[in-house]
Amino acid sequence: MKARNESMSKGEYKTKSLKNRPDPTQPKLKKPSWIKAKLPSAKHIGRVKELKQVLREQGLNSVCEEASCPNLGECFGHGTATFMIMGHICTRKCPFCDVTHGRPNPLNQDEPRHLAKTIHAMNLNYVVITSVDRDDLRDGGATHFKNCTQAIRDKMPDIQIETLVPDFRGRLTVALDILAQQAPDVLNHNLETVPRLYEEARPGADYQASLDLLKRFKQMVPETKTKSGLMVGLGETFDEILQVMRDLRAHDVEMLTVGQYLQPSDFHLAVQRYWTPEEFKQLEQAGMEMGFTHVASGPMVRSSYHADLQAQGQFS
């Protein structure tokens, strides 16, 4: 793969070959007043720097930084983080996502040990482990997920672990069999958007395959909670989101997050609409009526934002 031209931004390089490439000259919608990320308080700034330093020393990546999450300051300030394993280079080029695309490096076989050591040093009670897509690996990275989960549990037997997994395209059966050998407390896989927008927003992904992943794992490991996440603002309708929620419940998904899509750069998909706090509240109420055990729905909600409280049904 050719190296990125230094004059080209990460977003421009990532989306330059897409069939439906976003138009960087498209006028941008003005952000409403309710789109505000919380900055870390003065007392938490030191903690944010400390956690970033720990990640660098252990050679680890946090999705909080790689995906430019708007809640980074708040979550790091409170001493929580979502760890991204298997490197920071993704084999997919979804035009809504700010993670780097390209040819990934070989797996770091010491990463599970380093990850467990770091989590132990941070004294976390709940941890979220996610990854880039690794279509270059025969099992999609499932064995590495399993090894990381095992290493963490060996170091901290009482910790709760949530894994936010990719779709394991073309190798789902093998991947699920491996993941079930060391099952997390919560298995999360994000549908991201409505099926009508998959070709544009999730090229290479399959809506039904993602639903099947969630249902099949729940059937294999009934005691593991299943979870998914959606973003809104790409042009979907309220009714389309409700239908996706119904599909999730029909596939035994118990927990849901819904948040506003925010454009990482001019070269990513543009925001078509900002949903109001009232609409997010309506989605939360509808989800609870459908039978979800918990729904976190709000403009700044992200898949792993306050994941520990979501798992305990304490965050709204």
From Swiss-Prot:
Pfam families: Radical_SAM. GO terms for cellular component: cytoplasm. Coiled coil: none annotated. [4Fe-4S] cluster 2 binds at residues 90, 94, 97. Residues 76-293 form the Radical SAM core domain. It is found in: Cytoplasm. It catalyses: [[Fe-S] cluster scaffold protein carrying a second [4Fe-4S](2+) cluster] + N(6)-octanoyl-L-lysyl-[protein] + 2 oxidized [2Fe-2S]-[ferredoxin] + 2 S-adenosyl-L-methionine + 4 H(+) = [[Fe-S] cluster scaffold protein] + N(6)-[(R)-dihydrolipoyl]-L-lysyl-[protein] + 4 Fe(3+) + 2 hydrogen sulfide + 2 5'-deoxyadenosine + 2 L-methionine + 2 reduced [2Fe-2S]-[ferredoxin]. The keyword Iron applies. SUPFAM superfamilies: Radical SAM enzymes. Pathway: Protein modification; protein lipoylation via endogenous pathway; protein N(6)-(lipoyl)lysine from octanoyl-[acyl-carrier-protein]: step 2/2. Binds 2 [4Fe-4S] clusters per subunit. One cluster is coordinated with 3 cysteines and an exchangeable S-adenosyl-L-methionine. It comes from the Bacteria. GO terms for molecular function: 4 iron, 4 sulfur cluster binding; lipoate synthase activity; metal ion binding. Its EC number is 2.8.1.8. Its cofactor is [4Fe-4S] cluster. Residues 1-33 are annotated as: Disordered. [4Fe-4S] cluster 1 binds at residues 64, 69, 75, 304. Belongs to the radical SAM superfamily. Lipoyl synthase family. This is Lipoyl synthase. It comes from Hydrogenovibrio crunogenus (strain DSM 25203 / XCL-2).
